[in-house]
From Swiss-Prot:
Family: Belongs to the heat shock protein 70 family.
Alphabetical keyword list: ATP-binding, Chaperone, Nucleotide-binding, Phosphoprotein, Stress response
Protein name (database record): Chaperone protein DnaK
Pfam families from the UniProt entry: HSP70
Stretches for region Disordered: 569-600
Phosphothreonine sites (modified residues): T175
Keyword Chaperone: yes
Inducing or repressing factors: By stress conditions e.g. heat shock.
GO-annotated molecular function: ATP binding; ATP-dependent protein folding chaperone; unfolded protein binding
Gene3D superfamilies associated with the record: 1.20.1270.10, 3.30.420.40, Actin, Chain A, domain 4 (3.90.640.10), Substrate Binding Domain Of DNAk, Chain A, domain 1 (2.60.34.10)
Classification via InterPro entries: ATPase_NBD, Chaperone_DnaK, Heat_shock_70_CS, HSP70_C_sf, HSP70_peptide-bd_sf, Hsp_70_fam
Taxonomic source organism: Mesomycoplasma hyopneumoniae (strain J / ATCC 25934 / NCTC 10110) (Mycoplasma hyopneumoniae)
Function: Acts as a chaperone.
């Protein structure tokens, strides 16, 4: 019987790679064209599906050639081709099926399992979509792991005994990511992520294309953009030139018979110096510097704390990129593994772990943004803070906001702002069948659980009746890395203003709760209450109501402190008079949070 093999797949925006473990060592598999990288492009022509290099060559000439589908994963958008609409998962599945097919030919037997990598900032919907793409392609996705974690595995950092902090600089074809990881005791933990979801090696290619178009117009009186085939050749040559300039100071651009000019065929011969190329792309290099600084800041470390800097993505071969990294971090980056293949190698290693081929490595990833629920007054109450290591399960006890409330709405939010409305709404569900009781008495346990693949499940349970509702968050809109960073930045910029709003809301909720409590005490005690005590309570209630109307938060807080102390003394005196030791049911659970779930 053939030994179980689990494919390690880097399903990239621009290119994809597949690797396996063979004799306990990672091996990157070549596609039918003899390359280890396969363009993540699918084209349809005459009812035929074309994937990879052949499809990429049709991008300019075939309107039914589809690239960068990874950007749409997890959304409800579709792409039109072959006289029908395709979901992003379906197109990704065709890429995965192609990788699976040529991997099986290399291996010599069928393979049904895979580990697939995703960016660390991918949300639940994007991760679920990736798993579904694998399923459509005939693959059982054993694990979804973050790309920077896979890179660290590939570099063998799990074999190091000492604690390490590592920065992964990933410049792909269409996206750019920076991640900071911590390695301790053979475990990886992603501390932070940053980047630019619309920056990649293609942008460097485009600068060369623009330079070529300008030069060809000036020297040959021909506009390559007017001819789709000519433009395709220009883009191919631009990529080759970029690669050449990583190893040599000058590259010759040769494009024979590019098109027809006034005087016959146009044969282009141009030279581009590395110094010119670096000058025209300096602004792109600069765009990668800020995410490095941001990632370090989020991880709360200095550049001097880094033990390793790892390079991922073919574009990191550019000398200007390496020079900028070394200058910014004062550390030479590790270039010991092919940057095009490193993520797939890491995925294959994780596959080897799952297949029992490699001794166990524990991978720890983190949540990119805080997860919580909306509580009374519109407060965003966090349950799982940003950068919490996953897998994780956290629970908190909440209660009702109204007397005799039998149903609560659980609104799940994601973000760093203190008010729910300022964060991203991920989903909501109702828990009904709560036993009627005074506000604050029912105990509703809300639990968040995030599994190893980053999929979030939220449940709410009435501890008395046992009634429970659960949802798996599968939001149809996704967050790009820029949006995540923007949310973090907005939270920082609005921290003081948000804190004031939150303080006002919490004080209002506290005052309304005390008014409710005092009015209930007067009603419950009836004639037993001392007239003078009753008059004092009614006066205090009115003072609170007046301050609420006037929205004087500071005065209201002072008055609350005074009245709460008086109310406590009154409650103790009443209890002694009644000669009862009956205690407040809420006092038995120190974990009950003093924030109630609002009634929808």
């Amino acid at each position: 019987m053939a030994k179980e093999i689990i494919l390690g797949i880097d399903l990239g925006t621009t290119n994809s790679v597949v690797a396996i473990i063979e004799n306990q060592k990672p091996v990157v598999l070549e596609n039918p064209n003899g390359k280890t990288t396969t363009p993540s492009v699918v084209a349809f022509k005459n009812n035929e599906e074309i994937v990879g290099d052949a499809a990429k060559r049709q991008l300019e000439t075939n309107p039914e050639a589809i690239a960068s589908i990874k950007r749409l994963m997890g959304t409800d958008k579709t792409v039109r081709a072959n006289e029908r609409d395709y979901k992003p998962e379906e197109i990704s599945a065709k890429i995965l099926a192609y990788l699976k097919e040529y991997a099986e030919k290399k291996i010599g037997h069928k393979v049904t399992k895979a580990v697939i990598t995703v960016p660390a900032y991918f949300d639940n919907a994007q991760r679920e979509a990736t798993k579904n793409a694998g399923k459509i392609a005939g693959l059982q996705v054993e694990r979804i792991i973050n790309e920077p974690t896979a890179a660290a595995l590939a570099f063998g950092l799990d074999k190091t005994e000492k604690e390490m902090k590592v920065l992964v600089y990933d410049l792909g074809g269409g996206t750019f990511d920076v991640s900071v990881l911590e390695l301790s005791g053979g475990t990886f933990e992603v501390l932070s992520t940053s980047g630019d979801n619309h920056l990649g090696g293609d942008d460097w290619d485009n600068e060369i294309v623009n330079w070529l178009v300008k030069k060809i117009k000036e020297e040959y009186d021909f506009d390559p953009k007017s001819d789709k085939m000519a433009l395709t050749r220009l883009k191919e040559e631009a990529e080759k030139t970029k690669i050449n300039l990583s190893n040599q100071s000058v590259s010759t651009v040769s494009l024979p018979f590019l098109g027809m000019g006034k005087n016959g065929p146009i044969n282009v011969e141009l030279e581009l110096k590395r110094s010119e190329f670096e000058k025209m792309t300096a602004h792109l290099i600069d765009r990668t510097r800020k995410p490095i600084v941001d990632a370090l800041k989020q991880a709360k470390i200095e550049a001097s704390d880094l033990d390793e800097v790892l390079l991922v993505g073919g574009s990191t071969r550019m000398p200007a990129v390496q020079s900028m990294i070394e200058h910014t971090l004062n550390k030479k980056p590790n270039r010991s593994i092919n940057p095009d293949e490193v993520v797939a190698i890491g995925a294959a290693i994780q596959g080897g772990v799952l297949a029992g081929e490699i001794s166990d490595v524990l991978l720890l990833d983190v949540t990119p943004l805080t997860l919580g629920i909306e509580t009374l007054g519109g407060i965003a109450t966090p349950l799982i803070p940003r950068n919490t290591t996953i897998p994780v399960t956290k629970s908190q006890i909440f209660s009702t906001a109204e007397d005799n409330q039998t149903e609560v709405t659980i609104s799940v939010v994601q973000g760093e702002r203190q008010l729910a409305a300022d964060n991203k709404m991920l989903g909501r569900f109702n828990l009904s069948g709560i036993e009627a009781a005074p506000r604050g008495l029912p105990q509703i346990e809300v639990s968040f659980s995030i599994d190893v693949n980053g999929i979030t499940t939220v449940s709410a349970k009435d501890k008395k009746t046992g009634k429970e509702q659960t949802i798996t968050i599968k939001n149809t809109s996704t967050l790009s890395e820029e949006e995540i960073n923007k949310m973090i930045q907005e939270a920082e910029e609005n921290r003081e203003a948000d804190a004031l709003k939150k303080d006002k809301i919490e004080t209002t909720v506290r005052a309304e709760g005390l008014i409710n409590q005092l009015e209930k005490s007067i009603t419950d005690q009836g004639e037993k209450i001392d007239p003078k005590q009753k008059e004092l309570l009614e006066k205090q209630i009115q003072e609170l109501k007046d301050l609420l109307k006037e929205e004087k938060t500071d005065e209201l807080k002072l008055k609350l402190d005074q009245i709460e102390a008086a109310a406590q003394s009154f409650a103790q005196a009443t209890a002694q008079q009644a000669n009862t030791s009956e205690s407040d049911p809420k006092a038995d659970d120190s974990n009950t949070i003093d924030a109630e779930i609002k009634q929808d």
